[in-house]
């Protein structure tokens, strides 16, 4: 029910490129309360870290190249920042819930909608509209006050070919690093149309993650950690945080919501010719605070 004409997938023993794949089962198994890039840490050539420690502040390197030299795609659409090539994972917190697979292509590859990057290409595929009717509710708890609730529902494919999938989740936590609390919600919906015997397949998907979180600078010296730590070096110390009127306060606070909408149409004109059309758009609103 989901179209795939514009999604770049390397085929084993056919596509001449080093590639690794992560299944939906592995994503759910390794996800937990990790950052989404950390799921890829066991893949050869990949290095992911939480960086400052704030929710969504992680980064990933591929073949030693940072994210500005790595193409990152969601359902075939490039999501790197158009000005500097960076990717802010806090905008895509919900991928752990909705991703059905990840494929990492190391080195230059063939992509339809993104400029091939020297580091490689990370393709993330979201869940298709499920053909089976049903739903689920799950609750997750973790260290440092982390809590996450996920609810999903699939209408199942009707006799006329329509199907709908919806997922909502909410998370919050205090953060392992001092004064790095965060809270957010994730949303995803997909509507598919694929009648039996038809040569047309249509799919609309909409996903996003509204959030706010406190951050920690990464350029603080070891001397500062020694001076301000209670006993020796305090790895949880945060130069930006403290308390104000009895509540947590941070000079660096990030807040953003950047949904992505995609419409795909696949048309099998004949046995030798197929037309794949994709229309996508993304608009964000938010910002951040910090010392002058």
Regions found by a protein language model. Name each.
Residues 192, 201-264, 289-292:
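Acidic/polar loop-and-plug regions of large Gram-negative outer-membrane beta-barrel proteins
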Residues 84-85, 104-106, 133-136, 170-175, ...:
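Extracytoplasmic loops and strand-loop junctions of Gram-negative outer membrane beta-barrel proteins
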Residues 59, 78-106, 125:
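Short acidic/polar hinge/loop motifs at secondary-structure boundaries
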Residues 16, 37-78, 100:
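Extracytoplasmic beta-strand/coil segments of soluble accessory domains associated
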Residues 40, 101-104, 122-124, 277:
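Non-catalytic regulatory/gating segments with a bias toward low-complexity or hydrophobic composition
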Residues 1-29, 67:
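Short, acidic, small-residue-rich periplasmic hinge/interaction motif at the N-terminus
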Residues 134, 141-172, 177-216, 256, ...:
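Transmembrane beta-barrel wall of Gram-negative outer-membrane proteins
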